Every structure is written in structure tokens, then in C-alpha cells.
């Protein structure tokens, strides 16, 4: 993101601060006084940038380029977004959040494409895509992402599973742990791996405190870790994927969800039903309709946009991610 006449926001403030500290002799406005750090890029700032360009043998256009920002250690914070099953990476609650913050000059938005149309899920493709992006020092369009750049991540539904797997396998305990110190914010929406009892206070329909994601035995625990205070979970009560109980009924839901979303299977719902019965053991006849209904419900949620979430990011989610630039 370049800075030019009319630019405003946190990045302009950071640039002004660096110029005042490092180039005090010429970080002066047209009136000869030191630049005023008001977060606005005007004629005073343009004058200083042209002098910087002259001294660094560049064309003197008064525009702070991505290359200049990188040279000054001012690469813009990056927000990665991972939408849900059968999604378009450019649209959804994650995309809306990051798009708005990019428009406000807070951060640069990098959507993440992965194989989101498969059932069973192909979460590994999302983890690999994130590993390639976060592990690089330059994003695909040339945006600088050097070590030390603040960054954040948002995931929704299947994308929340991808984000959780990525943070768990690559950032907390993996080859990209060098990015951990610069991870400022992570946010999961409707996460099947939601930690039990963890939910943001601004959820419009908060779940019961003694619930977690449908993947009961694979909850993404951040409490007591280095991510505590940096990771948030937003969940709406009634979302089968992110609201489950740690009891026999909850374990049955987890088993069915695991078979549908993660295991290899062929033969449609009949094959799934056979595998579920084999997994659950002796099932009384009167329980079969309930199991069938549960399979149908999870199949529907796995194959369709989640009905429990709007496609517009909530204010609390946006403000949480805004701190990526703090």
C-alpha cells in the first residue's frame, strides 16, 4: 500500500514517526517546522518524501512506495482470511472484516484460496496455502511481508478449522514459529474446534458456557498458551458445528461429523450410515431416526453456507482485528 496525497491512518502515523526520528534534519514541513504527526499525508509529508527520494537516488514523485516502507521497516500489517466450505475467498464474514480494515488503511488484506469444495474436507490444502503465504517475505502481488511484520488471521467454519490447524501445526509447534511473535490477532467464527467455554463477549447469541466445537476431542486450546489474549472465538448458539457438549450425545455428534467431513468414504449417505452404526456400536432401533436426522443435518451444514452467520462482519470482530496494527 503506497502513501500519497490524501492518505491517512495508522500507517501514515508510523511513517511520520520514523521520519522524525531518523531524518530530523529534513523532516520539516513547508513552514520549516517539524512534521506534525496527525496521521494525514499532505503537502508537508510529500515534501519530506521527495527529499528522501532525492537522497536515495529515486524518481522524486513524493509517493511512499512499498519498497520505501520495507526499507524503513514499515511493512503494513497483513490480515489473512480463510472462508468456509464451498466459499468464495473474496466474500464472507472474514473477507468483509479485512476488506473494511484495508479500506481504512489499517492493514493489507490477503485472502487465502484452498480446496473448499470437497467433501470430505481437504483442510490440508488450506494449511499448505497458508504455510506458503505466511512463510514468504513477499506476497503474490509483491506486497512486502518481511520478518517482523505484524499480522493476523480470520477463519470461518471450515476455514476456522484450517486456521486452527495452521496455528497449531505451523506457528505454535512448527517451522513457522518465527512468525509467532508478530501474530497480533487471530479470530475464528463458527469453529468446529472451538475451545470449551471460549466465546467473545460481543456474540449476539452466545452459546452455553459448558460447550465447545463439534470436534470435542480436538478443541483448539489457546488458554494458558502464548496465544491467550491474541486469539478469539465468536460463536452463535444453535450452530451445530461450533456448539457441542462433552458427553455421550456430544461424542456421537463428533463421530458423525468426523466421518462426514474428514474420513474417506464412497457410496453416499447409505455408506455413511453404515460406518456410523459400526462406530457407535449397538444402537437401539428407536435411536436410528435420530441418528439419521443428525447425519442429514451435518451433511447439510457441511455442504451449504452456514445459516447461523451473517455475511457481514460484526462490529466487535472488526474492532478485535483492528488491533493487528496496535
Model-assigned labels for residue ranges:
Residues 153-164:
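Gly/Ala-rich beta-loop-alpha elbow adjacent to hydrolase catalytic centers
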Residues 12-16, 46, 69, 94, ...:
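Extracytoplasmic/secreted envelope proteins and their assembly/folding machinery
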Residues 25-37, 142, 206-215:
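Surface-exposed intrinsically disordered loops and tails
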Residues 81-113, 117, 124-140, 169-326:
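Surface cap/lid and interfacial helix-loop subdomains adjacent to catalytic sites
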Residues 2-71:
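Short acidic, glycine/serine/threonine-rich helix-capping segments at coil-helix boundaries
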Residues 136-150:
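Gly/Ser-rich "nucleophile elbow"/oxyanion-hole loop immediately N-terminal to the catalytic nucleophile
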Residues 75-77, 146-150, 181-183:
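A general structural motif
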Amino acid at each position: 500500500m503506497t502513501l500519497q496525497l490524501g492518505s491517512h491512518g495508522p500507517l501514515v502515523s508510523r511513517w511520520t514517526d520514523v521520519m522524525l526520528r531518523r531524518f530530523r534534519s529534513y523532516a520539516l514541513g513547508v513552514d520549516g517546522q517539524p512534521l506534525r504527526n496527525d496521521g494525514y499525508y499532505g503537502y508537508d509529508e510529500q515534501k519530506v518524501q521527495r527529499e528522501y527520494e532525492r537522497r536515495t537516488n529515486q524518481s522524486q514523485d513524493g509517493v511512499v512506495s512499498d519498497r520505501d516502507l520495507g526499507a524503513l521497516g514499515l511493512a503494513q500489517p497483513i490480515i489473512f482470511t480463510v472462508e468456509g466450505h464451498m466459499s468464495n475467498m473474496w466474500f464472507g464474514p472474514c473477507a468483509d472484516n479485512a476488506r473494511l480494515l484495508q479500506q481504512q488503511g489499517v492493514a493489507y488484506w490477503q485472502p487465502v484460496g484452498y480446496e473448499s469444495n470437497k467433501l470430505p474436507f481437504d483442510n490440508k490444502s488450506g494449511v499448505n496455502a497458508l504455510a506458503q503465504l505466511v512463510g514468504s517475505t513477499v506476497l503474490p502481488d509483491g506486497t512486502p511481508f518481511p520478518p517482523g511484520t505484524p499480522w493476523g488471521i480470520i477463519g470461518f467454519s471450515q476455514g476456522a478449522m484450517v486456521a486452527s490447524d495452521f496455528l497449531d501445526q505451523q506457528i505454535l509447534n512448527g517451522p513457522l514459529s518465527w512468525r509467532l511473535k508478530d501474530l497480533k490477532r487471530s479470530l475464528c467464527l463458527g469453529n468446529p474446534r472451538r475451545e470449551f467455554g471460549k466465546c467473545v463477549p460481543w456474540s449476539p447469541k452466545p452459546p452455553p458456557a459448558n460447550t465447545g466445537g463439534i470436534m470435542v476431542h480436538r478443541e483448539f486450546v489457546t488458554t494458558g498458551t502464548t496465544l491467550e489474549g491474541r486469539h478469539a472465538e465468536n460463536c452463535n448458539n444453535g450452530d451445530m458445528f461450533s456448539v457441542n457438549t462433552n458427553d455421550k450425545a456430544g461424542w456421537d455428534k463428533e463421530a458423525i461429523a468426523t466421518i462426514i467431513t474428514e474420513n474417506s468414504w464412497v457410496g453416499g449417505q447409505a455408506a455413511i450410515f453404515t460406518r456410523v452404526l459400526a462406530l457407535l456400536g449397538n444402537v437401539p432401533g428407536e435411536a436410528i431416526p435420530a441418528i439419521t436426522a443428525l447425519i442429514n443435518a451435518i451433511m447439510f451444514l457441511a455442504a451449504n453456507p452456514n445459516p447461523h452467520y451473517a455475511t457481514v462482519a460484526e462490529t466487535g470482530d472488526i474492532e478485535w482485528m483492528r488491533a493487528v496494527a496496535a
